Amino acid sequence: MHTGCCTTKFDTEVLIIGNGPAGIALSSFLSGMHPFYDATHPHENVTVHEKLLANHDFSLIDQDLSWSSNLTELSQSGRPLSVLYDMLVRPGADMGSDAPGCIQWELNRRREIPHMVIGETKIGGSWNEYDAEMLTVSFSDWMDMPGFTMEQWLGGRPLVKRLPSVAIATYLKKYVERLRLRKKFHQYFVVNSIKKIGDVWVTSGKRSTDGRSFVIRSKQVVVACGKTSPRKLQLPNEEHCSSNIVYDVRALKERLDATKKTVIDEDENYDTPSTSTCSPVIVVGDGVSSVDCVRHCLERDIPVVHVIRRTLRELRNVMLSRLSPIHYSEYTDIYRMMIGRSVHKNYQRVLDASITSVSKIHVEITTGSNREIIEMPYSTVAVCIGRESHFSTVFENAHTFLDYQSEQDETLFAVGAYAGDHFVRFLVGGCLRVAQHITGAANNNNVTAKLLPIC
């Protein structure tokens, strides 16, 4: 890379910031991995089949797929191409069908567009940070990257639908190696600034491994980093009590292990007391992450007070309510407790509630229409109210994105969670759309033309 004040060429044509599933999928598309409609496996939707059959000699990247926004079953999501891609690679997936996909993959290195992928972590992004034993919410085949599936990597269909997060992190690394993308990926790059100077994006920051600065110049930038920063309670005393507050199940496990009391009995006749007599863990939130924390505590006989912002009526419509007890029994069991359908000696819920004050020994929970205040002692507070991205602060100007492209600058894009696609099964379609934008621009311009220096 060039770090001087003046250079005769850019570091790369396209800079992808984020080395998780979104960055990996987009890198694959830009490296020449292209999807073609497989006419031998026609899709059951007649309109989709006829539209794609008419251009089946062209990859989806080279086709105008704007017609997809006119199909009701695709447009309702607001991301028609994401849904179209998903229904082509996994037809009938939501109905439990194992029908073969309608896509053939071809790797054409001559179509490669020069690009770099940088990330703050190891390849795989936030999948490296999750609790290794945590099972994915998505089924294993919903995690497939373009052209090399989870099933191909495993050497056969897995015996279970959901795999632990460590398997997903490993698959993503192996995928990058299998497609020979490794040289494009640069780990532990922390971005501090992104500026547009003329027609050039200048991205700068430091490497977390050695503190060395970097500067990358590119014609286009794609923000592919997820929402990695946990949302906090935003209470005045929260930072002062940070040693007692965690934001995911992995950190909760580590804290409980660190504070666990060991009873030493020389005569070996002393029964270890149940941990249910200690102050409870207070879990805040009503999503999957909060349920992971509740479940871990109950499995260890630790009392839990579950603080839920929603009312009972609202709680009946959350994502957890739609999970199948066949495949997600660990979540549906806790969900039944959340809505009062079942009870557990160590579980207490507080609905229509929020934590309004925290000290090192107790919290204040405000609940109900009359805003009753409950003072509750605690051992640990697990705050699981979602994640957010602070990445927008690195830009000089604010950007809004439509169809994955900045409305303020057509050379800036966003994919993955940053663009609102939170599940891998849908974010790959978003990457396909950005690949269309970038490939179309490359076809309309001389990519190899000499570029002016930045001074």
Curated annotation (Swiss-Prot):
Record bears the keyword Flavoprotein: yes
Disruption phenotype annotation: RNAi-mediated knockdown causes abnormal binucleation of primordial germ cells (PGCs).
The protein's required cofactors: NADPH
The entry's keywords: FAD, Flavoprotein, Monooxygenase, NADP, Oxidoreductase
Listed InterPro entries: FAD/NAD-bd_sf, OKL38_fam
Cofactor binding note: No monooxygenase catalytic activity in the absence of NADPH.
EC class (word): oxidoreductase
Superkingdom of origin organism: Eukaryota
Effect listed in the UniProt record for changing residue 303 to S: Normal monooxygenase activity. Intercellular bridges between primordial germ cells (PGC) are unstable in a proportion of embryos and eventually regress, prior to the start of epidermal morphogenesis
Xref: Gene3D superfamilies: FAD/NAD(P)-binding domain
Predominant localisation class: other
Subcellular locations according to the entry: Midbody
Function (record text): Monooxygenase catalytic activity. Involved in regulation of cytokinesis; promotes rho-1/RhoA activity, probably acting locally at the midbody in late cytokinesis. Monooxygenase activity is required to stabilize structures between primordial germ cells (PGCs), termed intercellular bridges. Dispensable for fertility.
Family: Belongs to the OKL38 family.
Further remarks about this protein from its record: Capable of rescuing defects caused by knockout of a human homolog, OSGIN1, in HeLa cells; rescues the activity of a RhoA reporter, membrane stability in late cytokinesis and cell ploidy.
Stated name of the protein: Oxidative stress induced growth inhibitor homolog osgn-1
Organism: Caenorhabditis elegans
Lineage of origin: Eukaryota, Metazoa, Ecdysozoa, Nematoda, Chromadorea
Gene name linked to the record: osgn-1
